């Protein structure tokens, strides 16, 4: 089973969208194997967005992601990374397909409600940044015995 990292950003938390997003994830068949509400500090934010250091938008990005709590999750399932990315929609909500999380809830590219790993490598790196191994659980969903 593939794992991916997904995070409801501060704008999503502040707007009360955690439940809606979790519902969509579970209805799609992805399993949440770790989750926590947390406040990201600057050090963790810089590690998370290290590839953007030196870019013109870096300080705004760090300021936003540390501005309020986030809901961090590890999702598990067949093709979990691609499935989560399709559910989220394009980064720019104006370009996101109707019915995606960003098309339905995001206001602006810089306030786009949700983050998800874009590759297996980034998923592994982000999961390790945000979760200790003992925080990631393994369990069987009731429907698993029937599939």
Swiss-Prot record:
One of its GO terms (molecular function) is ATP binding. Pfam families: NDK. Gene3D superfamilies: Nucleoside diphosphate kinase-like domain. ATP binds at residues 9, 57, 85, 91, 102, 112. GO terms for cellular component: cytoplasm. It is found in: Cytoplasm. The active site is at 115 (pros-phosphohistidine intermediate). It catalyses: a 2'-deoxyribonucleoside 5'-diphosphate + ATP = a 2'-deoxyribonucleoside 5'-triphosphate + ADP; a ribonucleoside 5'-diphosphate + ATP = a ribonucleoside 5'-triphosphate + ADP. One of its GO terms (biological process) is GTP biosynthetic process. Its cofactor is Mg(2+). InterPro entries: NDK-like_dom, NDK-like_dom_sf, Nucleoside_diP_kinase, Nucleoside_diP_kinase_AS. Major role in the synthesis of nucleoside triphosphates other than ATP. The ATP gamma phosphate is transferred to the NDP beta phosphate via a ping-pong mechanism, using a phosphorylated active-site intermediate. This is Nucleoside diphosphate kinase. It comes from Listeria monocytogenes serotype 4a (strain HCC23).
């Amino acid at each position: 089973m593939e794992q991916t990292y997904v995070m409801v950003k501060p704008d999503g938390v502040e707007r009360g969208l955690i439940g809606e997003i979790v519902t969509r994830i579970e209805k799609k068949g992805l399993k949440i194997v770790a989750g926590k509400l947390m406040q990201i500090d600057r050090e963790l934010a810089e590690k998370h967005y290290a590839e953007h250091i030196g870019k013109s938008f870096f300080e705004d990005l760090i300021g936003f992601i540390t501005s309020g709590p986030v809901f961090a999750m590890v999702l598990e399932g067949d093709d979990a990374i691609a499935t989560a990315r399709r559910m989220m929609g394009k980064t720019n909500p104006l370009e996101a397909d109707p019915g995606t999380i960003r098309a339905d809830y995001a206001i602006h590219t810089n306030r786009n409600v949700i983050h998800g790993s874009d590759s297996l490598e980034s998923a592994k790196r982000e999961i390790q940044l945000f979760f200790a191994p003992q925080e990631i659980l393994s369990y069987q969903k009731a429907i698993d015995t029937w599939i």
